[in-house]
Every structure is written in structure tokens, then in C-alpha cells.
């Protein structure tokens, strides 16, 4: 083999795996049907965070201190009634530890799919109540409330895991973000 062919073959071994990485797939957590994002609100579809998430499955809002105050408000208004103020669980399951009623929720793609498409019981789909961007922000707040060992938090990057402190509620009146 000539040197140019060897270099070309080597280059292809680097290019093909990158090209083979497909965008994440989103399915209804209950029936397995593909989620239809045409149902989503128009507002909040084209943010950089949403575009990045739909291409990679990575929520750039996770542990972003700038969005946490708004994320807390979204969670308080849409989720805390069932899941508890600190995601400790009420009539809905707890969301702040390493146990997931739907194991797919351990990933951001899975949690997003549950938010978007709904789950069993009283957890209806959120596509008519939250924008796609608001869903990502709400997910970031849920992830922020995590009380477990950071090594088990698959949604965090290695860098985020190194600096992550498990959530502990502060005394009444203190900012939780």
C-alpha cells in the first residue's frame, strides 16, 4: 500500500465513526411510539439549547447557574405539586435520587421524553404546557436537586461530576439555586 492510501485509510477510520453517530431518538415512555415534535409550541423550538439537545441529547442547561432561578420557578409551577418542592416525591415519584420509576429517565433524552410525552398516572404530556426550551430548563432544575453520589449522575459531564455537590435544602427563605 502506498503512503497516500495508508493515510486515506487512516482518515476514514476517524471520519466514519463520527458520521455514524446519529441524533438521539425520542420515544413515548409508555407505548414506545416516536414523539412528534410538531405538537410542540412554536415558541422555544429554535433556541441554541434545544437545537443542541435534539442533535446530541446533551442538556447544556445542566448545572448552569444563570438559568437555575427560572428553572426553579418552572418546576415549582408545573411539577412540585406532585413531585414535591425538592423533588422528594408526593403523589408522584421522587426525582432527586438515583432511583427512576422509568429507568430511561436516568438520561436526559429519557427524562425529556417523559416530560414531553407524559407517563402513567396523572403525569400528562407537557408539550402543550411548556416550550421545548422550558422543558430543558425544568430538567436542569430536577438534575440540580439530585441528592445522590455524583458518580451515579450519568447526565453530568466528568467535569460537572468533579464539582457537583449533592443538593441539600437550605433553611427557609434562602435562595435554593
UniProtKB/Swiss-Prot annotation:
GO terms for biological process: methanol metabolic process. Heme c binds at residues 79, 82-83. Keywords: Electron transport, Heme, Iron, Metal-binding, Methanol utilization, Periplasm, Signal, Transport. Induction: During growth on methanol. Binds 1 heme c group covalently per subunit. GO terms for molecular function: electron transfer activity; heme binding; iron ion binding. Electron acceptor for MDH. Acts in methanol oxidation. This is Cytochrome c-L.
Amino acid at each position: 500500500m502506498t503512503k497516500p492510501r495508508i493515510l486515506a485509510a487512516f482518515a476514514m477510520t476517524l471520519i466514519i465513526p463520527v458520521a455514524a453517530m446519529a441524533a438521539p431518538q425520542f420515544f413515548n415512555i409508555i407505548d414506545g411510539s416516536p414523539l412528534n415534535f410538531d405538537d410542540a409550541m412554536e415558541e422555544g423550538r429554535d433556541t441554541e439549547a434545544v437545537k443542541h439537545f435534539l442533535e446530541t441529547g446533551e442538556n447544556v442547561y445542566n448545572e448552569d447557574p444563570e438559568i437555575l432561578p427560572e428553572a426553579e420557578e418552572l418546576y415549582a409551577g408545573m411539577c412540585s405539586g406532585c413531585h414535591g418542592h425538592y423533588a422528594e416525591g408526593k403523589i408522584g415519584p421522587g426525582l432527586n435520587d438515583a432511583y427512576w420509576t422509568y429507568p430511561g429517565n436516568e438520561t436526559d433524552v429519557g427524562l425529556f421524553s417523559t416530560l414531553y410525552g407524559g407517563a402513567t398516572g396523572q403525569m400528562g404530556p407537557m408539550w402543550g404546557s411548556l416550550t421545548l426550551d422550558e422543558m430543558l430548563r425544568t430538567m436542569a432544575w430536577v438534575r440540580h436537586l439530585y441528592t445522590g453520589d455524583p458518580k451515579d449522575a450519568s447526565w453530568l459531564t466528568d467535569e460537572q461530576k468533579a464539582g457537583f455537590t449533592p443538593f441539600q435544602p437550605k433553611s427557609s427563605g434562602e435562595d435554593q439555586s
